[in-house]
Amino acid sequence: MAMLSQPNDGHDHPEKKDPDTTPKQVAGVISSQDPPHPAKDVAEERARTDWDLKEMHEFLEGDEAKSEQILRLYQSIERDPILQTRPEQFDYTQKQERELVANRINQMTKFLETEPYGKFRRRLQLMTVIDPSLGIRMLVNIGLFLNCVRGNGTQKQFDFWSNKKEAGIVKQLYGCFGMTELGHGSNVAGCETTATFDEKTDEFIIDTPHIGATKWWIGGAAHSATHTVCYARLIVKDVDYGVKTFIVPLRDSRHSLLPGIAIGDIGAKMGRQGVDNGWIQFTEVRVPRFFMLQRWCKVDRQGNVTLPPLEQLSYISLLEGRVGMATDSYRIGARYTTIALRYAVGRRQFSKKAGEPETKLIDYTLHQRRLLPYLALTYAAAVGTDRLERQHEELLANLDIALAKKDKLLLKNTITGTKSMFVDSGSLKSTLTWLAADLINETRQACGGHGYSSYNGFGKTYDDWVVQCTWEGDNNVLAMSAGKTIIKTVQQVLNGKELKDSTLEFLNAAPELSKAKKAVIRIRDHVDDVDRVLKAIAGLISKFSKDLIPISYQSWDSIGAQRVILSKLRCHYYLLETFNERLNDKIKAKSPARPHLENIIKLYYVTNILGPFIDEFLRFGVISPQVAKYITYEYPQKLCANIRPYVIGLTDSFQQPDNFINSLIGKYDGNIYTNYLESVKDVNDPSNYKAPYSEALEAMLNRSALENRERSERGKAAADILSK
């Protein structure tokens, strides 16, 4: 160490040394040797899991076979170099995203050719969660297009377009769904594209008479589709028979537009930039008469039109999309509650006392109240949407059998089932897609600033998701329709009709429930009784509907908001009923999973049904006022405290792998900060520290003095000269 020079003043001075700059260990000072350990926190909480994850996953998915198939498909997807996710994909431009989707479609069609269709549908369902653009671009063909042909066409027509023309494996033909128009969306019956029969040539002339009839939002139309199933008004001998469906070719074998077809891209959207949504205009486009789908409505060579009484079944093709979106709500919910709860366990903020470790986010009661009700909802949605899928598959199978065998009894029961399915799918699709949108947004906010990073998935998924609330049935329109059916059903039951072969059979109790004077839930113990809670929901639906019947005679529109509430209540009854039945059927009393599922089901109905609709329950006297505070405040907090220690195990039970979750802060290992920083560095090379637009920044920072840029024309020297 160098010595300081001594002053030469004739006196002795003690030797002076340089100050000691060696770091000292001082309490409370941050040490580089002690970084945060979120992975340790997550691992410790994972060790609390005291149930079999396999049993829990089978409970969520419905059975062992489906659970095993889901897990193997996850594995297949994350191993596939084209289908797997990577952080850099969050930075893709629209052009890059569409190219990625096109490559993924190509890859997916190889599975479509070789594996059973049921397995492929499950694969596509999973891919739709991580790449919604891929999902919709494939589903417009194998879902909407082919389901419309199947539901509206004859068996020979379906065989021709699906098998001979190979639309079923997306080969030769790529179909799109030409329903919505610039001027009409939800009101399909109001579509104005025309299909006029020319008896001389045995052709239909498809035409867009004005701008409002331009087909709009047509997925796949801009670049991909070779054909469309066009919803157009059937006009024969100057008579308008309403909207029917027609196959219309759009492009030739070289993918060039056919004469009379005008198509364009509708441009940038809020989300799903990988989908080539387009507009279509037809100018006197001629198609053969047999290009009209004629399972229900028929037009013969002489222009005679036959309209069968079962034509309402033609809209059954729309059900698969609604069922699929309800199921997507479950998987989206599982993905984002997993991310948010892993982060909430690994992330610490603020100390309760100086010198103590910071508190985990999940240990704050507000954080529990924000996230755990969504976790419970996701469990309920898993079980309920599995039932809805199976119900839909059975309905389609019975319809095909009934029509093929001309079995009138089975057909009658199928029609009843179809009516129920329209209510069930409409109420579940609308309610769950709304709730999933709320879930994504709330879980994002619960992750603070890091939730705003694209690499953690929330932003893109939210932008991609919310279209679910307005397509294939606008949620408010669907909910009002379901609510209207519920009111009419209650009215029929009050008039003496008994419901059979319907999922609305619980409304057979409406005469008794609607007149009940005593509240169903009167004391705290009643809130723990699931059967009593189901009775309370049925009672509210019955009383609410009965109250609305006189108003409906005057105007259905004036009770639109109430119809939406009834639809939501019907959805929740469906989910709770299904959850309760499966819990009792599949989980044994001594199973370690059972107490956790009992807490989950209670938190679900307390925070998603009884609490949000407490005003209605109180207004109609279904719940006593003295238990309202317990329901809305005290009991939810108690249930959250019971569930809190097991949040990692409860989200692990979804069994979603890291590649599927696709979030840097939501990985299984819980190593939030390392995963985040290293991936961000990989995607954004730190050596590229100069921006492409650095020249503009440097010009701004290094600009010359204002006086020089004004050529010294405004300075004092110039003023002295010019003022004389």
UniProtKB/Swiss-Prot annotation:
Catalytic activity: a 2,3-saturated acyl-CoA + O2 = a (2E)-enoyl-CoA + H2O2
Any one cellular-component term (Gene Ontology): peroxisome
Compositionally biased intervals (Basic and acidic residues): 9-21, 37-48
Group of enzyme by EC: oxidoreductase
Keywords per UniProt: FAD, Fatty acid metabolism, Flavoprotein, Lipid metabolism, Oxidoreductase, Peroxisome
EC number: 1.3.3.6
Pfam families listed in its UniProt record: ACOX, ACOX_C_alpha1, Acyl-CoA_dh_M, Acyl-CoA_ox_N
SUPFAM superfamilies associated with the record: Acyl-CoA dehydrogenase C-terminal domain-like (SSF47203), Acyl-CoA dehydrogenase NM domain-like (SSF56645)
Alphabetical GO biological process terms: fatty acid beta-oxidation using acyl-CoA oxidase; lipid homeostasis
Transport among keywords: no
Compartment(s) where it occurs, according to its Swiss-Prot or TrEMBL record: Peroxisome
Keyword Flavoprotein: yes
Cofactor requirement: FAD
Pathway recorded for this protein: Lipid metabolism; peroxisomal fatty acid beta-oxidation
Region described as Disordered: spans on this chain: 1-48
Family to which the UniProt record says this protein belongs: Belongs to the acyl-CoA oxidase family.
Name recorded for this polypeptide: Acyl-coenzyme A oxidase 2
Organism of origin: Candida tropicalis (Yeast)
